[in-house]
Amino acid sequence: MLVLDRDADVPMHRQLYEKLRAEILAGHLKADTRLPPTRMMAEDLGVSRNTVITTYDALLAEGYLESRSGSGTWVATLPPDAVTARNSVGRAGAPSLSSRGMRMAAQPRDRTIPDRIAFHPGYPEIKAFPFSTWARLLKRHARYSHEDLYGYHWVTGHPRLKAAIAEYLRASRGVECAPEQVIVVNGTQAALDILARMLVDEGDICWMEEPGYIGAQNSLLSAGAKLVPLPVERDGWSLEDETRPSPRLIFVTPSCQWPLGCLMRMEDRLRLLQIGERHDAWIVEDDYDSEYRFRGRPVPAMQGLDKSGRVIYMGTFAKTLFPSLRIGFIVVPPQLADGFKRVVSNTGHYPSLLLQAALADFISEGYFATHLRRMRRLYAERQKVFVALCRRHLADWLTIDENDAGMQLVARFTRALEDEVLWRAAQGQGVNFSPLSRQFFHSPPQQGAILGYAGIDPKTMREGINSLRSAFLALESSGALPLDRATAAPRGC
């Protein structure tokens, strides 16, 4: 029987990881033993389901467990000598990871598995990118013309790219900044890692949207932060709560909330700025998917409304161009620019200057604006097609939360069903999506599917939805899905 110590300094997920690992290595949990579902294990131990998911993920990643499509999580077969060796190493007291390393290794991840059809959220239509233009711009700078492009210069970004980003943000998002305030980094996760290093101390309170971006959760937790949920509901963000402890940092995605797609109203933006000032807290504004608003007028970024210099703005080109470009940016208050420069230099979180030079031309010569307009039209049309297909073929099992922006939609189940169960069944049909429950870290998770549509053409969309339909039918025939419709769960935004 597994017993966890609630008074110990070791996090619950780490205790559970160590105990399950020890049981496997000792042979008490034998190969081909099926582990309880995450919800059942959580109820038996009196912990959150995310604690169990985090533990299972860590053991899956290290090869102690294996996931079998449609049948759950099982103990993997380990070579006998490996078990003996690992046991002896453990008894000898081998060096272990640091506390920070343990936190990082144990963080949950949004698993993606190679598959035939992937409803990946936030994935752009790469085939529509003007690669011939991009190749020409790269070739322009690939010829040796200036030593600065091939050395360790400009660690916070190519000057022309910083200027182009600053001008674009001023014109399109109302962001007020000089080029010197723009820090160019290796994508969103690099930005989050730098922000966590620079702004958060061990034990600091951070308000985090729930449901919210798992990458931000992981970066803050790895820095030793204590996450306090900032609930996102149908009528907006739950900002006022006197029982919520004073934060050091507040993380929000106000332009297209991840994953629900809500838009934070102007009055809530102003209220959040007041809250940040009252608590002397940093506000990290991830302007996720702000470029893809299909209806209504865009709301300016919070950074441009900030009068006290506490909003740090971040964005990425992964969603507007292509993911492997790995170029993102942070806009920091002027007084932080020099400190961020030193951290970026020391961590190596800066992308290729050759790519930056080509991107600067891509923006300044108008190709970026043209591509955005084209993608906005394409994604708006794909959203209409996707919603219509879901309503036509999947209405017996789910409803779609429509919104006016973004590259994905949230589907809610009309019957009692765990999204991880559907996820495993969908894998068996060659389809992948992101379960909604993985985006919760504190409250009982809502069940649903985050379905990306932007990077999928209508023909593939139909195939994927038919495969999802087959997954639902398979669950019905196996008895895993009740035939009666359940009361709809809270719909969020």
UniProtKB/Swiss-Prot annotation:
A GO MF annotation of the entry reads: DNA binding
N6-(pyridoxal phosphate)lysine (modified residue): where? K319
Q: Which residues form the HTH gntR-type domain?
A: 10-78
Output one GO BP term: biosynthetic process
Q: Which UniProt keywords apply?
A: Aminotransferase, DNA-binding, Pyridoxal phosphate, Transcription, Transcription regulation, Transferase
**Domain of life of the source:** Bacteria
Signal peptide (UniProt feature, chain positions): none
Under the heading Pfam families, the entry gives: Aminotran_1_2 (PF00155), GntR (PF00392)
Function field: Could play a regulatory role in the transcription of the moc genes for rhizopine catabolism. Could also have an aminotransferase activity.
* Protein name according to UniProt: Probable rhizopine catabolism regulatory protein MocR
Write the gene name: mocR
